[in-house]
């Protein structure tokens, strides 16, 4: 049986810092970001199903979100202003991501490749699934801005404003629910979020 380097590569996502051009109070890596996006995407899917007549596979959504940035272990995390500077750069970067996704899939034993292709290759996801994961990704970036601003880091002021516009463009009922019910807590201190539920 041949060895596979797939999970050894994925373990290196923790070495890739996000927001590399910004001063951060606390550095965030791609691995922890992916887990937070999985939490939020799963929540959005549950909210959509329970409150807004959705019919999403919530576990699949969580897995898609968990792997949504996996290709960055080969490409690195390109800053958003560069990645989307114009349509041509965005298109070319998508092609690079696709190549990286395929390279990751090919690292797996052949008998496992199709299972992971369903998670890593965008062409196997529905428009609705992609939309939920993108909403969660944008929400998590927004939450990072709130955390940095709460810690006194004004560096994230413009990023927050840009992300507010992105969230308006990706607007949905489930996102509104999440923003109303869960997001305000991210601007509070540990004492403030703990006072209602002491151990």
From Swiss-Prot:
What protein name does the entry list?
A: 5'-deoxynucleotidase ECA3034
Its Gene Ontology cellular component terms are: cytoplasm
Single GO MF descriptor: metal ion binding
Q: Which organism is it from?
A: Pectobacterium atrosepticum (strain SCRI 1043 / ATCC BAA-672) (Erwinia carotovora subsp. atroseptica)
Per the record, where is site Appears to be important in orienting the phosphate for catalysis? 18
* Sorted UniProt keywords: Cytoplasm, Hydrolase, Metal-binding, Nucleotide-binding
**What residues bind a divalent metal cation, as annotated?**
33, 68-69, 137
Q: Which Pfam families match?
A: YfbR-like
Q: Which InterPro entries match?
A: HD/PDEase_dom, HD_domain, YfbR, YfbR/HDDC2
| EC number(s) stated in the UniProt entry for this protein | 3.1.3.89
Q: Which reaction does it catalyse?
A: a 2'-deoxyribonucleoside 5'-phosphate + H2O = a 2'-deoxyribonucleoside + phosphate
What subunit structure does UniProt give? Homodimer.
Q: Read off the SMART domains from this record.
A: HDc
Where is this chain primarily localised?
cytoplasm
Q: Which residues form the HD domain?
A: 30-142
**Protein family (similarity comment):** Belongs to the 5DNU family.
Note the coiled coil stretches, chain numbering: none
Does the keyword section mention Zinc-finger? no
Q: Where does substrate bind?
A: 18-19, 33, 69, 77-80, 137
What stretches pass through the bilayer?
none
Q: Give a yes or no for keyword Hydrolase in this entry.
A: yes
Q: Which cofactor does it need?
A: a divalent metal cation
Q: Describe its function.
A: Catalyzes the strictly specific dephosphorylation of 2'-deoxyribonucleoside 5'-monophosphates.
Q: Where is this protein found?
A: Cytoplasm
């Amino acid at each position: 049986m041949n060895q596979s380097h797939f999970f050894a590569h994925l373990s290196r996502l923790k070495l890739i810092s996000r927001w590399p051009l910004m001063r951060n109070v606390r550095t965030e890596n791609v691995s922890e970001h992916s887990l937070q996006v999985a939490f939020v995407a799963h929540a959005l899917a549950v909210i959509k199903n329970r409150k807004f007549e959705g019919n999403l596979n919530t576990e699949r959504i969580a897995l898609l979100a968990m792997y949504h940035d996996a290709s960055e272990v080969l490409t690195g995390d390109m800053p958003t202003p560069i990645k989307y500077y114009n349509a041509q750069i965005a298109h070319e970067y998508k092609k690079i991501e696709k190549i990286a996704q395929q390279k990751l899939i090919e690292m797996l034993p052949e008998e496992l490749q199709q299972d992971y292709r369903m998670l890593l290759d965008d062409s196997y996801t529905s428009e609705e699934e992609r939309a939920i994961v993108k909403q969660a990704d944008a929400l998590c970036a927004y939450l990072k801005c709130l955390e940095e601003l709460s810690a006194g880091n004004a560096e994230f002021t413009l990023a927050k404003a840009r992300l507010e516009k992105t969230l308006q463009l990706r607007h949905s009922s489930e996102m509104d629910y999440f923003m109303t019910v869960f997001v305000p807590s991210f601007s509070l201190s540990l004492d403030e979020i703990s006072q209602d539920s002491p151990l």
